[in-house]
């Protein structure tokens, strides 16, 4: 709502957030069985098709244009360097611009085969270094939201739970 979306758009954005990587289901058997091995250039090109595959899946299932375009363009960077269409600035639908910020943040605070998760504070610092990729107005809304006292406490609790689980695993 801080970004000026209607209640209906907020609801649709939550659906797009749940479905934004649905196109990866089409490629899971090929790419995600690799485990710790780095992806080849051809595999990276293939993975970059997931927004287009997600677009096809959601189009066939009659989702709204807002949801479909948010999914299709969620890897577009504000400076035009993203994919699949190299859109820039306001050419990128607002839902996709919001998803881009959230998707990058979620990726940074998650473990990956090639690196450990960053703290949420470090993730924000990394995103600030790459600010050209994001709509500044929306990024400032994002910062306001995640610096809310309740949200900060939830992020800290999630990090602590993760650390506690890791410690339990170490002793087994």
What kind of region is each of these model predictions?
Residues 1-172:
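Histidine- and acidic-residue-rich, metal-dependent catalytic cores
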